[in-house]
Amino acid sequence: GARRGYYQLGPVLLRTGDLFGLVTRDSEGGGSAHLTVFPRIVAIRHARFPSRRPAGEARARARVLEDPTLIIGIRPYQHGDGLRRVHWRATAHTGQLQSKLFEITAQMDAHLLLNLRRQDYAAAPGDAAETAELGVTAAASIAHHLLDKRQRTALLVLGRDPAAADQGGGLRVGAGRAREQLAAILSVLGRAELGEAEPLPATIRREKDQLPWGSLVVVITPRVDEAALSALLGLRASGYEVSVILVGRGARLPAEAQALGAMRISASRVVTEADIRGLGI
């Protein structure tokens, strides 16, 4: 099949001439168009993706999630309530400790973050282009699996978009699970290329302030250095589910990686497409 990518079609080159080929004339006809070839999708056969409901929405470790941005009332303070939960205005009004009552939400978005920052691939062993393709295939396969399970899924790619003039914001698809969502994600992944981008740690810290609380964040990258590790730990400590997928033959975690396990962050290695089939988050 055609190789994944973003291709220009046209303009058509027209060549005319006499019967003997002594005189020829070249001219261009028509305009040009572009074609995006989607990436491969590998079926995740024995997925260990967490599922909250039969419909397939991913879950946090708790059966339900409380959204601290949605306060729906107050209740008397209970032993174990943190200071952030205390409703100080209501406490002052009643003379007794009162705690905030949060909206219960049963939905948790999945956010895929694919790192195609050229510098990170140059620093990792192995062929950069081959490793990048593996990362794109992993992202496409995970998105397909999650959306097939009716999980709201979003995508952010750190890299170059040949179809866009401004590369500053990366290639992004907002969270959704409509029928068109997979096509939108595959279209972005089809265009994505290695390129200049914001460093992964800075992106994680910036995105943390915008993600819905309790979201599942899947980071696909060829390497995790100490700065990225610190950002991942900060993300987990803030209440997000975090999974790291390292791609490429030389994918290694730093010596401090045992901290991931201590914080219950899953880490997987993908060296070949066959490894994608058994991915779990």
Regions from the PLM with identified roles:
Residues 1-171, 216-220, 231-234, 238, ...:
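An amphipathic, basic-hydrophobic helix/alpha-beta surface used to engage anionic
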Residues 40-41, 127-131, 178, 199-203, ...:
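Secondary-structure junction/capping motif
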Residues 70, 84, 106, 178-185, ...:
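Alpha-helical structural motif
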Residues 81, 174-183, 263-269:
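Short, structured secondary-structure boundary patches
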Residues 102-103, 145-147, 176-180, 207-211:
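Short, conserved, surface-exposed binding loops centered on an aromatic residue
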Residues 136-143, 182, 186, 204:
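A general structural signal for well-ordered alpha-helical packing
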Residues 164-199:
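Short, charged loop segments at secondary-structure junctions
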Residues 187, 191-281:
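Von Willebrand factor type A / integrin I
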